[in-house]
Amino acid sequence: MGQKPITFLRQVSAICLYPELLNDNKFPDDVKQKALRILQACGGNSLGSYSASQGIEVVRQDVSRYIERRDGGIPSNPDNIYLSTGASDSIVTMLKLLVSGQGRSRTGVLIPIPQYPLYSAALAELGAVQVNYYLDEEKCWALNVTELQRALHEARKHCDPKVLCIINPGNPTGQVQSRKCIEDVIRFAAEENLFVMADEVYQDNIYAEGCAFHSFKKVLFEMGPKYSDVVELASFHSTSKGFMGECGFRGGYMEVVNMDCAVKQELTKLVSVRLCPPVPGQALLDMIVNPPQPGEPSYKQFMAEKQAVLGNLAEKARLTEEILNGAPGIQCNPVQGAMYSFPRIQIPERAVRLAQSEGQAPDMFFCMKLLEETGICVVPGSGFGQRDGTHHFRMTILPPTEKLKSLLERLKDFHQKFMQEYSP
């Protein structure tokens, strides 16, 4: 999408991959020191070696320190950190560990609707029971415990719900859950004995005024031993999102909290089957959780680049909401975080009937027409799940500002034309 890579991350990666560059005076000293520290933690001082299945020990230690800083000093144990091939790998691994049983005793997993399709796909592959709970679109996609209770009680008629998945900030919905909401969810999980999976890969992507990222772990521990000693939690982060956007490195981690020792041994066996996560991805993760510090040569440039990326995304989030809400028949909630908007669109009844006659969801029909006539590619809301009778699409806010502005105006014009064409 034209985003310039973060210089520090690419410089350290370059040296790690080609250590001869340690002798090149073009690289700042802190870059060389960081690369050398990572290489010395690798087998044979090379990124080409296997690592321990749980990940390089030094990187896991740095991840723990990062979590402690993020969460205001709440302790994190490197032994509870599992490095992974992006967050997706550890999410699927955790689901494999948790899913069991047959028939009515089959594990049910509560997932938000709309959801990131990784979850529904993984549950289908594992033969788990998908239990949908709906986010509240009228309240900016907030999570409502009453809705969780409804979903859980309905599910208990045909499966054994054991797991609650949360995506915060949201994908595809771009919301940031409030601290109160997280506290309510933790109480609910404790009361119902649910394992919580907190997908927090967009934790750096917060744009809306008044919104803040609260990690599930931090809130859990601040609620005191009644909850922090009881609720089982796995939280996930990735190198693919945030300000870095280094998807191809496939770096990520999972932290587990309150996991029984015997179960944790089984988790370690499970991750050992895939040998180890990509070592270059582990190295990149280390640079992200242990970035340049004030006074170091790379600090000013690193912070300037990071703030520029996040500031630009915040401006595009505001722009997307503003332009789409200026179109009759499109309703776009504020993009509080993450990288997407998920606007609701009106589709005339004639277009709905035509789509159904062609075996298509109405929003897929709309998205295909949009692609054919404008070249703009968005994803139909039916691919993520939505309430019956509503239609949405997901679009990213990643294109450069001027291109995004033009794209949004063309999309707005197309929707108006579409409404006219298919209205009575």
Q: Where are the regions a protein language model picked out?
A:
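PLP-dependent class I/II
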Residues: M1-Q54, V58-P424
